């Protein structure tokens, strides 16, 4: 909806605001692309440390360019930063500048971020923000994303794949391109044999290569006569050279590759919305917000998550927000809408003993997670500020606890409750509940994967701090994921010690340590006491992952990490690797 024109001088100022914001986003986008484009060279030169630095730098870009834009606007606003009529007209001019753009939603989110900084918006402000809770923006995108398409003649699949690898060339050669192509062909034919004779009729792959950690991915689809499946070819460049390492055709495997418990891809896409539309065809159950986020557009992911949640929230007016299942936390109050798979986490005003950290330290831990390689074991946690909920939508028990335990984060505005800061995560089944609910075989597998999760995190310089089962959840693909970050720290910051051997009867019977324990001291031999696993599952974890309880393993790993020697953690099962 357009607003009436302003007097000529104000109208010119509104147009200047729109142009300045548009140019600021263009500058941000160019810098984002510049960093992302470096991923190819990082992969070719095996510069994994540089790749990690780029990932952190790219996340920080958004707020940097918002701050820079606000500085630019000072000369335009001339003291009228809070003139609502001026911003309403600026929004109209800005919308006109975006006409026809595939990624106009990204531009709108940038604009909204600015107005919220200027006006301190609580909830949403439909007069000056771009708000569309009732539409799915990607539905309007009909332009196909850039891709390569390859037809396959009967018996010529390997030849076609040789051509594919040639089209995706790098500064380093494939160690044996034909052998790689043949291995990919064998895997495709094995995976798709149930499609009948000549199962692979064509393959299409996005022109843009996806990079993350130590791998490059060719992402696309494989078509049979009557159906299609995802097709992701994973490339690795290590001491043995550049080669294809895995092929993923199962949606569950590809979904895990795009899981929101992993770090964001580096994919230098000229436009993003059309790529999201394509990826949705591969991962039909993956929410749009997670796809934007996994492509590095975390702010747009937050916008889409807000849009879809509140659209659902408004469509279910009789459903109340309630405490999430699981053991109540000492640091957070966690609530959910039962029919929607998100949780909202608020920091308590005071923490129960033995928690000793401050509120600022907790916020710092959640910020730290964005800077880490999350390797499929740390759940994305997005901060939201000044969310507005009708007070009547909270269950009485939840509202009472929020008012008494989270007063610093809570305020009331008429019939609404405003939440100054909360962290929003995908809702998972807490591991302690899952183990009680499942049959022995499934519980055994989950316990072993819990041990593997701790090991995977450790190999990427992440120590969970609190290993209790309640701090882990199980995804729909039966993976153990850590989601409670108030005690998380880096492996390189810890002091892994042997548990001293008692020398007297009093020491042997002491309920507390009889020796000095520093704030960073960790005793792996005692982990079993703090995991909370039933005896049979604990023994299975000890048998499968004995190194977790060995201080020497942790110290050796710590030495490697301090030398920037990070062990490789593949994002798929060993069975998916090529012969």
UniProtKB/Swiss-Prot annotation:
Active site residues per record: 380
UniProt GO BP: glucose metabolic process; glyoxylate cycle; tricarboxylic acid cycle
Reactions catalysed according to its record: L-seryl-[isocitrate dehydrogenase] + ATP = O-phospho-L-seryl-[isocitrate dehydrogenase] + ADP + H(+)
Entry EC number(s): 2.7.11.5, 3.1.3.-
Keywords: ATP-binding, Cytoplasm, Glyoxylate bypass, Hydrolase, Kinase, Nucleotide-binding, Protein phosphatase, Serine/threonine-protein kinase, Transferase, Tricarboxylic acid cycle
One GO location term (cellular component): cytoplasm
UniProt family annotation: Belongs to the AceK family.
Role, per record: Bifunctional enzyme which can phosphorylate or dephosphorylate isocitrate dehydrogenase (IDH) on a specific serine residue. This is a regulatory mechanism which enables bacteria to bypass the Krebs cycle via the glyoxylate shunt in response to the source of carbon. When bacteria are grown on glucose, IDH is fully active and unphosphorylated, but when grown on acetate or ethanol, the activity of IDH declines drastically concomitant with its phosphorylation.
Designated name of the protein: Isocitrate dehydrogenase kinase/phosphatase
Source organism: Xanthomonas euvesicatoria pv. vesicatoria (strain 85-10) (Xanthomonas campestris pv. vesicatoria)
């Amino acid at each position: 909806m357009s607003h009436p024109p302003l007097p000529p001088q104000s109208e010119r100022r509104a147009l200047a605001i729109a142009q300045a914001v548009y140019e600021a986003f263009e500058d941000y986008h160019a810098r984002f692309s510049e960093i992302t484009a470096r991923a190819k060279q990082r992969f070719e030169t095996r510069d994994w440390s540089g790749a990690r630095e780029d990932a952190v730098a790219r996340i920080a870009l958004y707020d940097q360019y918002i701050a820079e834009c606000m500085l630019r606007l000072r000369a335009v606003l001339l003291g009228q930063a809070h003139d609502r009529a001026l911003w309403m007209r600026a929004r109209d001019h800005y919308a006109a500048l975006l006409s026809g753009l595939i990624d106009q939603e990204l531009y709108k989110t940038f604009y909204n971020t600015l107005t919220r900084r200027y006006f301190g918006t609580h909830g949403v402000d439909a007069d000056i923000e771009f708000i569309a809770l009732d539409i799915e923006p990607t539905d309007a995108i009909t332009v196909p994303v850039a891709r390569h398409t390859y037809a396959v003649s009967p018996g010529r699949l390997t030849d076609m794949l040789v051509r594919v690898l040639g089209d995706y060339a790098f500064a380093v050669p494939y160690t044996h391109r034909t052998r790689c192509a043949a291995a990919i062909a064998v895997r495709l034919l094995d995976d798709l044999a149930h499609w009948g004779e000549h199962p692979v009729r064509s393959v299409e792959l996005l022109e843009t290569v996806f990079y993350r950690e130590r791998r490059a991915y060719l992402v696309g689809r494989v078509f049979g006569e009557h159906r299609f499946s995802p097709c992701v070819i994973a490339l690795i460049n290590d001491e043995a050279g550049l080669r294809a390492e895995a092929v993923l055709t199962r949606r569950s495997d590809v979904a895990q590759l795009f899981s929101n418990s992993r770090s964001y891809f580096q994919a230098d896409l000229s436009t993003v919305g059309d790529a999201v539309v394509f990826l949705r065809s591969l991962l039909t159950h993956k929410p749009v917000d997670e796809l934007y986020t996994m492509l590095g557009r975390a702010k747009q992911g937050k916008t889409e998550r807000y849009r879809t949640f509140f659209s659902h929230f408004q469509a279910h007016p009789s459903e109340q927000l309630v405490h999430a299942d699981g053991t109540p936390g000492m640091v957070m109050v966690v609530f959910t809408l039962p029919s929607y798979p998100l949780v909202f986490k608020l920091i308590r005003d005071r923490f129960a003993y033995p928690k000793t950290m401050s509120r600022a330290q907790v916020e710092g831990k959640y910020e730290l997670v964005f800077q880490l390689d999350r390797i499929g074991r740390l759940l994305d946690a997005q901060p939201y500020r000044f969310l507005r909920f009708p007070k009547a939508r909270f269950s009485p028990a939840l509202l009472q606890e929020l008012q008494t335990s989270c007063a610093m984060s809570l305020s009331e505005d008429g019939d609404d409750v405003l939440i100054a800061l909360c962290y929003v995560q995908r809702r998972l089944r807490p591991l302690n509940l899952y183990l009680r609910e499942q049959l022995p075989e499934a519980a055994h597998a989950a316990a072993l994967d819990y041990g593997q999760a701790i090991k995977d995190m450790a190999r990427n310089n992440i120590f969970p701090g609190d290993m209790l089962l309640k701090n882990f959840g199980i995804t729909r693909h039966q993976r153990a994921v850590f989601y409670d970050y108030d005690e998380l720290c880096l492996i390189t910051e810890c002091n892994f010690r042997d548990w001293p051997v008692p020398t007297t009867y009093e020491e042997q019977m002491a309920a507390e340590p009889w020796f000095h324990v520093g704030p960073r001291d960790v005793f792996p031999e005692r982990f079993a006491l703090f995991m909370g696993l039933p005896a049979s599952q604990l023994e299975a974890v000890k048998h499968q992952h004995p190194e977790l309880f060995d201080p020497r393993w942790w110290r050796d790993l710590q030495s490697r990490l301090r030398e920037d020697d990070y062990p490789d953690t593949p994002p798929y099962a060993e069975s998916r690797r090529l012969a």
